[in-house]
Each structure stands twice: as C-alpha cells, then as structure tokens.
C-alpha cells in the first residue's frame, strides 16, 4: 500500500475510534487514539501482522479493541498512557519554552507593529494618533501595565517623550520598515528601563508588579508542592515494588493478585515519579536563574543611581545601555514567572492520572498485601550492594565502566531509565533501580545497570536474550515504551522530532586509566627547511625575482620564429688619460707693454712736468 493511502486509512480508523468513544460519552484526543492504534497493532496477542495490508475485518477488530481499551476507566495502564500523551503534548524544555513564548508575543504584537510601520501620517491629528499607537505598543511589548489605564499611559508617554519626542516622528516615518521595527524595540527597552528606575526611586512604576518578590514566594511554594507529590508517588512505588518482589519469590501468589494489576499500577506511579522529577529539576533551574538575576538587577539599579546622581543632564551613551539591560532582566523575570506557572499547572494536572490507586488499592488492601514485607526505598536498595563490584577479569569480551575510571559517569544514558534489565526480564515486569557502583555494562554502544552483581553476571552471559524478552514485554504493555525509553526499538510509535531528542542525550563515556609513555630523543630525522624565510621583505624580493624570471626566454620555450634570437651585447674600453711629446717647443706671445714717465722728481719751487716715454717693442720685432 502506498504511504499516502496508508496514512489515509489510519486517519479514517482514528476518526472512527474517536466517534465511537464520543458516542459512549468519552472525548479522546487524536494523539491518544493514534498511540493506542499503534499499541494494539504492536501487541502480538491481538494477532495483527504489520507486514500485510489490513482487511475490513482487521479494521473492525482494531476499532473494537481500541475502543474497549480507551473506555476501560479502571485500568492503570490506560491512565499511564494518558499521562504520557498529556505530558508530551504540554511539556517542553526550558529553551524551547522560552523560544515559543517569545514567538507568541511577537505574533500578538505583529498587527500593532504593522499599523505603526505602515502608517503614512501627514497631518497633525494623524501624527498624534501614531504617537499614541507607539505608546500602546511600548506598553504591550513590555508587559508593564494596561494601555487602557490612564495613569499608566501618562507615565509611559512621559518616559517616551524624554527619549523620543513627537517632533521626531517625521524622521521616524522616513525609515525603512526593518529600521522602524528595530527602533520600536529599542524604544520599548529604554522606556521600560526608565519606568523601572523611576519605580525603584519611588517616583513612578504605576502598574508594575514586584516580580522578584513574587518569584521568591512562588518558587519555594511550587517546589514544596512538587516535593510533596513526589514523596507520595515514591512511597506508593516502594510499596508496590515490595509486594511484587514478594510475588516474584512466591509464584503461587501471582494468580491471587492478578486482578489487582499491581504491575500496571507500579508502571503508573514510576512514570509519574519521572515526570515530577523532570518538573522539579526545571523549578530548581528557575530558582538558580532568579537568584542570579536579582543580584544583577540590584547591581544595575545601583550603577544607574551613581550615574545620574545630582546631575541635570547625563549623556545617553551612559544611561541607555543600562536602561536596556534593566529591560532585558525584567523580561527574563517575566519569562520565569510564566514558566513557574506552567510547571505548577503541569504538576496539578498529573494528579488525576493517579486516581485508580485509591480505587484498587485502599489502605486496608495495602496493609494485607504488605503483611510480612519490608518496604525499601531505592536508596536503601542501592546501599545494600554498594560494595559489590563486577570483576572485569571475568569478562574478556565485554566492557564494564566504573565511577573511578569514567570521567562523565553520571551523564551516561542508561538503558531502561536505569532500572535493572535482568530483574525486569526474568520477573513479571518488576522494576528495581540499578546500582551503577556495581558496574555499568557497555554492550553495542548501550549501557545497562543491575541491582546486584549476580544479576549483572547473568545478564552478561546472554544480553541479546534478555533484550528480546524486554522488547516483547513492551509490545504487550505499550506504556513501557515511554517509561523505559525504548524509542529506538519502536520508532514507528514516536515522532522524528522526539527521536532527535533521544540521540541528543546520548553521551559516550570518557574512560580513565593509568598509562605511561616514553619518547625517543630523536625519533625522526631533523627536517630543517633551509629555504625558509621569516622576513617579509626577503620573500618579496624572491617573488620579484621569480616574476622577472618568468619573462625570460629560454631554449625550452623557443618557437619557430624566435629560436634564433639571442641577446646582443657590446664591449668598450674605459676612458683613460693620453699624452704626446714632440722634439720642438712651439709657442706664441705678444710684446709686453713698457711705458715710463720721466721728470717726476722736480724742485720745490718749480712746477713738476712729467714726460711719458713708451718703450714697448713693436709686434713684428718679436
């Protein structure tokens, strides 16, 4: 049958079963019906063959069996399956919840944000209306008061005008849609920070709840409520375990106690215990986060007071980051408040799935069944065999892990939720907690624990046999698939998204042992690269040299037209001083002027008369 046709047939079967149950006054969710259909088909006692197509009679038989099981209100097994379906549909991890919660807030604000970003206001009335919408958006996004309360609106408007006056709407309208959305978020955080600071100073904070104080009161109350529920469930589990342990030792009691469905009741309380432990773990995480955030909030407010102390004006670069940090912290407080509320509601809604215990096992019946039985807690059972350990030398082909030799011992994903595989397989479905101190068996990359050393040795002799027995028991009791985390063996019963979560939690062990190593002095020959250069400029010089060589022409790359070419060169002698000598001197010159003046020594009383005499020789005489 094609996959699409098979899906159509299954949907029709689920719809028909839902209608049948509704006709009997029982409204059953489709998820529960779908799980029940697959569980009934999987049970070998019902005679369905998953390898062949269902006939009309098979479909009628399947519908009848599913309706009967879904209407059996006195069956703890059905309550367990309902509990599992409810928890899977309503519980999400902390990270997923915060992501989904923020997505819901964004979707609710999308219409208001769209009205603001798509606005084309021009006239004064339209701009005033747009500004009022921005104030409403800030209040809705921050969650600090109702936008219909006049006092809250006035306070938010005053805070917004201090950082975003109405005169800046023109600039805001010119921005792109993404920039508008980003600015709206920033304005919301800044206004939220301002209002929180004013509230701390006693100058405002209308409509702002004291979330830190509320959480400090709600978390202990929720923790106490979950703890009390967990104690009740664990006490019931210990009593059922003690009775079933007594039955395992006395097979004659098995027939007498068959109508009581003790085994199914044990599965029911163990499943509830696991869910309550998950919830309690999340609450503890919330408490740790809130404690840390309260310290951060006090530190941010103190820093802000020191920054704005006795100052008329403070740079926005100093206070805006603190306002934004305050807003983010307050958003985290709001997230924790919603998360605590959801976890508390989950705990409350798990209680109705335990109603069959008071009906089947009133206190008088339990006292009779517990006659001569010692009720032991899980801790007591582990302490009884705390000193027993598996001798690794007895197993040559199997690997055993111990706390002393495994680094992440506490983080290993133990098969069957940590219950003893051997005890569950060899008894009538008795769930006893495994003792990791005895040793964890690693078999085919899976890890198994046991309540005693003898159980560990017996299981190790033939692991496949006991694993098959447990698988067959899970087919007959579908609630065991979720309870013992057998998802990988029954992938058809769970969604792919859940399979990814199973793979995500799978952690491989990190084993530790005493080892020693010794290295030779010179294990390998030295590899000194002589051509290595650390200097950048030397590398550049070599690169230039290679680039020049690339342009050179060598014989290996000659062509028909260039193979006769060669480089031309010329040689000259360097210049030097040269002198010559002859036998005769040759020269030429002109007469030297010889002019004299006579009669310069005259008498004292007579006038002196000088006579100029030119004795220069003629040119031709020389």
Curated annotation (Swiss-Prot):
Annotated signal peptide: none
Keywords of the record: Cell projection, Cilium, Cilium biogenesis/degradation, Cytoplasm, Cytoskeleton
Family matches, as Pfam families: FAP206
Family: Belongs to the CFAP206 family.
Role: Essential for sperm motility and is involved in the regulation of the beating frequency of motile cilia on the epithelial cells of the respiratory tract. Required for the establishment of radial spokes in sperm flagella.
Organism (species): Bos taurus (Bovine)
Single Gene Ontology BP annotation: regulation of flagellated sperm motility
Gene that this polypeptide is encoded by: CFAP206
Annotated PANTHER family: CILIA- AND FLAGELLA-ASSOCIATED PROTEIN 206
Subcellular location field: Cytoplasm, Cytoskeleton, Cilium axoneme; Cytoplasm, Cytoskeleton, Cilium basal body
Record InterPro entries: FAP206
Protein name (Swiss-Prot/TrEMBL): Cilia- and flagella-associated protein 206
